[in-house]
Amino acid sequence: MHLAEGVLPLGWCAFWNALALPFVAIALHLLRRRTEQDAFYKPFVGLIAAAVFAISCMPVPVPTAGTCSHPCGTGLAAVLIGPWMTVLVTVVALLIQALFLAHGGLTTLGADVASMGIAGAFTGYFAFHLARRSGANLWVAGFLAGVTSDWATYATTALALALGLSGEGSVTSMFTGVALAFVPTQLPLGLLEGVMTAGALAFLRARRPDILDRLQVVRLAPGAS
């Protein structure tokens, strides 16, 4: 979903950047507050940022949509550090990719953050916690977080392209066309990301349950480690 420089009209670039900015400001405030409470937190957020950067650096071109498909990693990030911090790590990952890898653009950064960091993160976070409250185990909830986060990201990207490029035509028709262009690549990638997210959480639960407990993802019984 890395929209290239010049894909969107400048007016829509300004709109998406204005939309993303308050989320980034809130995330920075929350990071400062959380770091004061727990010195472990900021380095862990940095680790997650590196993971999101690496995961989202595996593009599959989608020429008919003017962008590319790839796993995002924001579903897993949102489960571990919350959706607000995921917005921040997404900004860092996307900015580095745009500046040094020509992957995405600077004017389209707000649109990319809105899709991957906002829509993807919050959708995955709420899907995970809704599944857990409904009685789903960690694997199932993690799978749903990964899948819904990934697909929400690309649905929002399709919306951004439809709004920016439909011109006098139908936004709905443009959205449908772009969304369908993503299906051959993003349907399997979304399922793969669900498995990856579930597997990562299961691995942490088996090897480092203290991390999940510290991040309030799961609660250990008193005396457990």
Curated annotation (Swiss-Prot):
Is Iron-sulfur tagged as a keyword? Answer: no
Please give, as recorded in its UniProt entry, the membrane topology of this protein.
Answer: Multi-pass membrane protein
A GO cellular component term found in this entry reads:
ATP-binding cassette (ABC) transporter complex
* Annotated S-S bridges: none
Query: What are the transmembrane regions?
Result: 7-27, 43-63, 76-96, 108-128, 143-163, 175-195
User: Which keywords does this chain's UniProt record carry?
Assistant: Cell inner membrane, Cell membrane, Cobalamin biosynthesis, Cobalt, Cobalt transport, Ion transport, Membrane, Transmembrane, Transmembrane helix, Transport
**InterPro entries to which the protein is assigned, alphabetical:** CbiM (IPR018024), CbiM/NikMN (IPR002751)
Top-rank taxon of the source lineage equals Bacteria
State the Gene Ontology BP annotations.
Answer: cobalamin biosynthetic process
Where in or outside the cell it occurs: the entry states: Cell inner membrane
Its annotated pathway reads:
Cofactor biosynthesis; adenosylcobalamin biosynthesis
Per the annotation, which location comes first and is thus the protein's main one? membrane
Q: Which GO terms describe its molecular function?
A: cobalt ion transmembrane transporter activity
Q: How does it assemble?
A: Forms an energy-coupling factor (ECF) transporter complex composed of an ATP-binding protein (A component, CbiO), a transmembrane protein (T component, CbiQ) and 2 possible substrate-capture proteins (S components, CbiM and CbiN) of unknown stoichimetry.
Quote the function comment for this protein.
Part of the energy-coupling factor (ECF) transporter complex CbiMNOQ involved in cobalt import.
Q: Which family does it belong to?
A: Belongs to the CbiM family.
Q: What is this protein called?
A: Cobalt transport protein CbiM
Organism of origin: Sorangium cellulosum (strain So ce56)
